[in-house]
Every structure is written in C-alpha cells, then in structure tokens.
Regions:
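Class I S-adenosyl-L-methionine-dependent methyltransferase catalytic core
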Residues: 1-281
C-alpha cells in the first residue's frame, strides 16, 4: 500500500525531532575528514511546499517548524539547526525532507543513496535532487528501501549514517524495521542507524523501542518527544521517537541540552514531555 504522502505532514513536530537528530548526527560525521555514505530508506519528495494544498489542508507545520522560527531564544544547537534550515531552503514557503537536509550537510566526498517507492514522490525526489552538486554525489532509486539498504552494506568507506523512517501505515513495517536492522548489523555492525517511529496508542508502536533495545542492548540512544496527552479514543499520533544504534558519543548530551526547550515550544497541552535514555559501551 502506497497511500502515505508526507506533504500533508511536512514540518510537523515529528519532523523537528527527526531532522534535528539527523542534523546532529551528520554534523558529527563531518568532524572526520574521512568520507561516508548517507542512506535513506524512505526518502519522500525531498522538498515540500508549505503553501500547497496538502500542507494547508492539515496545517501541521504551524505546530512544528513555524513555532521554532517564532521562538525568541533557543539553545545553541537548536538555534544552529533552525538557522541552517533557513540557509538551505530555496524559498521561504518550502520545508525540507531528510534528503534535502542531508545533501546540504554532506560534503563533496560523501555519497547519498536515496530510496522511494511511491511513484509520484519518486518523480519529485528525482527532480529536486537534480539540483544537487556535484551530481555524482547522489543516487536516487525507485525501490524497496529495506532491500536497498541491505544491498549497499557494507559501504566502501566503512562509514555510514542510515535513516529508516517508514510511514508505519501497516503493521508489517514494525516487523520489517526490526528485521532489517538485524540483517544490517550482521553485514555492517559499526554503522549509525537512525530509526524514526510514531508514538501511537497501538501496541506495535509502544513495543517497538523495547524490540530495538534487544538488537543493540549496549549501544543505543532512545529519544521521544510527546506534544500532547494521548486522545481518549486512541486515535492519532501524540508524539514520535528516534532510536539510534551506534550513536555519536556527543548525541545524548546534545539532546539533553535541547529537548527540554523543544518540548516546551512544541507543547500542545500539559501532557507534553520528552524521554531520553542511552547506553553506550
């Protein structure tokens, strides 16, 4: 089923947690002169028009990126993140997907491997990534991202940051995420794997972090950002999470310095809060 379109949700609270984490991870990777690969299993369109019909229909960005842009004082890393977004977006009414953020952060020597199965989003992704220079840096494939990831491991430079963020419209996505991580770690155990997931009332969502901890019990970071109390009918996403296997050593401290303020800014009611836990060797 390919019904999910991120254009309806671009720039929302979940994007803030996901993209801020991705920003911190890639900035860390850039500290070393050695090249790396960025692999995105569910890339989406790359860029989104916040003035378009999809974004305006739901207006989720108004409780996400719009609130961060309006904030007076932000912690250092969060302020740098928001400033970087303003620099890399071609127009004021646009918001980036993970691939566009990554192309701005990766260097000429790094490689990007992007997967998107949805035919319409794939065309948009292709067109948007044509703007990237040098062109040889980016490869876009209309293919299953789970299979595509495994086919690329281990990457030639033996350094990689991987983002896995399926829509989780179907229960099988939860199982596939767990399985692809098991397979990926067998082929490339030192990669940095970032998994985004929605915080929902459904059992699969609530159990996913514990399932991921079983895969990497000694080297992970787990962060959640809840923006409101779960609805009594159990409907809808009240937050989202990032689970990072082999996280940069600085990431826990950076998130600890920024998540309290991010949670405060994006709070929709008194039930807003964040979760942060990590375990490293």
């Amino acid at each position: 089923m390919l019904s999910y379109r991120h254009a309806f949700h671009a720039g929302n609270h979940a994007d803030m947690l996901k993209h801020f984490t991705l920003f911190l991870v890639l900035e860390y990777f850039n500290r070393k002169d050695k090249p790396y690969w960025y692999i995105d299993t569910h890339s989406g369109a790359g860029l989104y028009d916040l003035s378009g019909d999809e974004a305006q229909k739901v207006g989720e960005y108004k409780q996400g990126i719009a609130l961060l842009e309006q904030a007076d004082k932000l912690p250092a890393e969060l302020a740098e993140f928001v400033g970087r977004l303003k620099q890399i977006l071609p127009r004021d009414n646009l918001y980036c997907g993970s691939p566009w953020l990554a192309q701005a952060l990766t260097r000429d020597s790094d490689k990007m491997r992007l997967f998107e199965l949805h035919p319409a989003d794939f065309v948009h992704l292709q067109n948007n990534m044509r703007e990237v220079r040098p062109a040889r840096k980016v490869q876009v494939s209309q293919a299953d991202g789970y299979q595509g990831l495994i086919s690329l491991l281990p990457p030639p430079p033996r350094r990689a940051a991987v983002l896995i963020d399926p829509p989780y419209e179907e229960k099988q996505d939860y199982r596939r995420v767990v399985q692809v991580l098991k397979d990926a770690l067998k082929r490339f155990e030192t990669g940095c794997y970032m998994v985004w997931y929605p915080c929902l009332s459904r059992e699969e969502s609530r159990k996913l972090p514990d399932e991921l901890k079983k895969i990497a019990p000694d080297n992970y970071l787990h962060a959640e950002l809840h923006v409101h109390t779960p609805h009594s009918d159990g409907f809808g996403m009240h937050g989202s999470g990032m689970f990072v296997i082999n996280p940069p050593y600085m990431l826990a401290e950076q998130l600890q310095n920024n998540l309290p303020e991010l949670s405060k800014i994006l709070a929709q009611d008194a039930g807003a809060h964040y979760v942060l836990e990590s375990k490293t060797k």
